[in-house]
Swiss-Prot record:
Residues 34-61, 73-92 are annotated as: Disordered. Residues 180-222 form the CHCH domain. InterPro entries: MIC19/MIC25, MICOS_subunit_Mic19. Disulfide bonds join C183-C214, C193-C204. Component of the MICOS complex, a large protein complex of the mitochondrial inner membrane that plays crucial roles in the maintenance of crista junctions, inner membrane architecture, and formation of contact sites to the outer membrane. Plays an important role in the maintenance of the MICOS complex stability and the mitochondrial cristae morphology. Has also been shown to function as a transcription factor which binds to the BAG1 promoter and represses BAG1 transcription. Residues 39-49 have a biased composition (Polar residues). The gene is CHCHD3. PROSITE patterns: CHCH. It is found in: Mitochondrion inner membrane; Cytoplasm; Nucleus; Mitochondrion. It comes from Homo sapiens (Human). This is MICOS complex subunit MIC19. Belongs to the MICOS complex subunit Mic19 family. Metazoan Mic19 subfamily. A lipid is attached at G2 (N-myristoyl glycine). GO terms for molecular function: molecular adaptor activity; phosphatase binding. Pfam families: MIC19_MIC25 (PF05300).
Length: 227
């Protein structure tokens, strides 16, 4: 003990699966072992046999180096953990932003779709209303046309009947006053006598007297019938 420094032979055994070394129950990585080898005094020697490493260092020095290397490894691990945590947070933020953008895009698309559907429904209702109004107007016009045709037919019938009745009345009226030549035979004889005796009309005086008597008799007969 005293001022002498005790030394012990420490064996570093390699782990085939995890590429680390066990030092008295402490698992060290190859990076730690390499740094320990590089920082060891020039008087220390390393030995290699069957994949194992040997090093002669003091117990205190070994503990110090192991503690330092473990602290470095821990700091490195914490730094890497912080980096991974930062990257994870950044990834989460990016994912959240992407999800928000996607949600907004879906919402905008949904709103646009709903607006388009609303416009389509409104247009359909307008077309239905216009079609209903047109059908109503068409039915009204057809009804009015039918009434006009009926009125025209009735007017034609009444007009025809009235015309026929008026024609019959006029015809009956004129038939009632229909006249025939009076004393037609004597009138013809007088005309013939006047043509034959142009310069001797007195020869026709006897026929003229008979014609006048015939006319007067006819007038008297008509007056008697009318009275």
């Amino acid at each position: 003990m005293g001022g002498t420094t005790s030394t012990r032979r420490v064996t570093f055994e390699a782990d085939e699966n995890e590429n680390i070394t066990v030092v008295k129950g402490i698992r060290l990585s190859e990076n730690v072992i390499d740094r320990m080898k590089e920082s060891s005094p020039s008087g220390s020697k390393s030995q290699r046999y069957s994949g194992a490493y040997g090093a002669s260092v003091s117990d205190e020095e070994l503990k110090r180096r192991v503690a330092e290397e473990l602290a470095l490894e821990q700091a490195k691990k914490e730094s890497e953990d912080q980096k991974r945590l930062k990257q994870a947070k950044e990834l989460d933020r990016e994912r959240a932003a992407a999800n928000e953008q996607l949600t907004r895009a879906i919402l905008r698309e949904r709103i646009c779709s709903e607006e388009e559907r609303a416009k389509a429904k409104h247009l359909a209702r307008q077309l239905e209303e216009k079609d209903r109004v047109l059908k109503k107007q068409d039915a009204f016009y057809k009804e009015q046309l039918a009434r006009l045709e009926e009125r025209s037919s009735e007017f034609y019938r009444v007009t025809t009947e009235q015309y026929q009745k008026a024609a019959e009345e006029v015809e009956a009226k004129f038939k009632r006053y229909e006249s025939h030549p009076v004393c037609a035979d004597l009138q013809a004889k007088i005309l013939q006598c006047y043509r034959e005796n142009t310069h001797q009309t007195l020869k026709c005086s006897a026929l003229a007297t008979q014609y006048m008597h015939c006319v007067n008799h006819a007038k008297q007969s008509m007056l008697e019938k009318g009275g």
